[in-house]
Amino acid sequence: MKETITKQLIAVQQASREIITLTDETINSLLCALADSIPSHQEAILQANQKDIERMDPADPMVDRLLLNASRLDAIAADIRNVASLPSPLDALLEERVLPNGLNLKKVTVPIGVIGIIYEARPNVTFDVFALCLKSGNATVLKGGSDAMYSNIAIVELIHSVLKQHGINPDTLYLLPAEREAAAVMLNAVGYIDMIIPRGSQKLIDFVRNNAKVPVIETGAGIVHTYFDKSGDLDLGKHIIFNAKTRRPSVCNALDTLVIHQERLADLPALVEPLQEKQVMLFADEAAFQALQGSYPDDLLHQAEPEHFGTEFLSLKMSVKTVSSLEEALEHITRYSSRHSEAIIATDPETTATFLKRVDAAVVYANTSTAFTDGAQFGLGAEIGISTQKLHARGPMALKELTTYKWIIEGNGQTRPA
């Protein structure tokens, strides 16, 4: 398997050198053609997706991530068109200066080269990643989860067909075999893949980080907190918490832990009351549990165990932590946060400012839902993931974050003195 994959990676490298020669107009034309082709291939894609769905437990929260339907395919097509409409991130002049010796220095954006993506049961990522990588001048190597195998194969077949129709090398996109051995080859493909981005659970991200020799940018895992301060507005808090927890519980920006100031425990039943509508299960510490007994359904209320804090639930479950001060809230968040998205609900300006300054996360919110952590919501277009690290990219990784830069130096015969 290694020999076969390596041979294909060499072809992908060659394709990456060809992509650099494409104009932005050519890339945009191809992306729009891909979006236009989705409706006519909808039946084949949905049939493949149904084969994947049938292999999963219907109660598994990952089913929502795996599911494709007509409306989701329409949204994917719209996202691809949106990527095509965005300005090219390439050849942007970042810096320019003329040195005393007359040399003209320019710092310009260029593609990274070959980007590898390893991800779990989200076939929409296959479309998104291809569009973003092509728009930013990169070739793409995909390692999808076995749960989405049939969906990914159908999607990549469509993309390859559109590439060929436009005279573009289909090796621009390579879908690795579903076997686990393929992931090991990918993670060690130094010299063939320039960067790997894992998208999925903390377990997947840890596996990639611990086993990759290729540079990695961590994305995805979100252990998300919202702190309801003693100065928090109750009505505001109810709407924010409901939205952050229930809008799409299986995504990485969904709320996992509500941290509440002990002086507002009397308001806790009202604060979480809307969650009953969605059957949200609460794991509350002792103080919060006592405050909720008799007001929150017994079958949905449980006493928290240590493991409930620091868990990315990805489902209709949420932990509740009581704190005695802002300082204790910050300590709790620092201990358990994945540095993805964190929020405060407060009306006191000093408390809010302290929280925003001291919380170490890619995105920090005041009096709004963490569900907004999304490239499109930020006005960046579709994103390849949410980076939770600090090097190269942080937060939504859109087109700009899929480029690097090089220095271009022009002279007229200058030589460096001995």
UniProtKB/Swiss-Prot annotation:
The protein's UniProt keywords, in alphabetical order, are:
Amino-acid biosynthesis, Cytoplasm, NADP, Oxidoreductase, Proline biosynthesis
**What function is annotated for this protein?**
Catalyzes the NADPH-dependent reduction of L-glutamate 5-phosphate into L-glutamate 5-semialdehyde and phosphate. The product spontaneously undergoes cyclization to form 1-pyrroline-5-carboxylate.
Coiled-coil segments on the chain, per record: none
**Gene Ontology cellular component annotations, sorted alphabetically:** cytoplasm
The gene is: proA
Q: Which family does it belong to?
A: Belongs to the gamma-glutamyl phosphate reductase family.
| NCBIfam families in the cross-refs | PRK00197.1, proA
Gene3D superfamilies given in the database record: Aldehyde Dehydrogenase, Chain A, domain 1 (3.40.605.10), Aldehyde Dehydrogenase, Chain A, domain 2 (3.40.309.10)
Q: Does the keyword DNA repair apply?
A: no
| Catalysis performed (reactions) | L-glutamate 5-semialdehyde + phosphate + NADP(+) = L-glutamyl 5-phosphate + NADPH + H(+)
- Give the metabolic or biological pathway: Amino-acid biosynthesis; L-proline biosynthesis; L-glutamate 5-semialdehyde from L-glutamate: step 2/2
Compartments (UniProt record): Cytoplasm
**InterPro entries on file:** Ald_DH/histidinol_DH, Ald_DH_C, Ald_DH_N, G-glutamylP_reductase_CS, Glu-5-SA_DH, GPR_dom
The name of this protein is Gamma-glutamyl phosphate reductase
GO-annotated biological processes:
L-proline biosynthetic process
Instruction: Supply the source organism for this entry.
Output: Pelodictyon phaeoclathratiforme (strain DSM 5477 / BU-1)
Q: What EC identifiers does the entry list?
A: 1.2.1.41
The GO terms this record gives for MF are:
glutamate-5-semialdehyde dehydrogenase activity; NADP binding
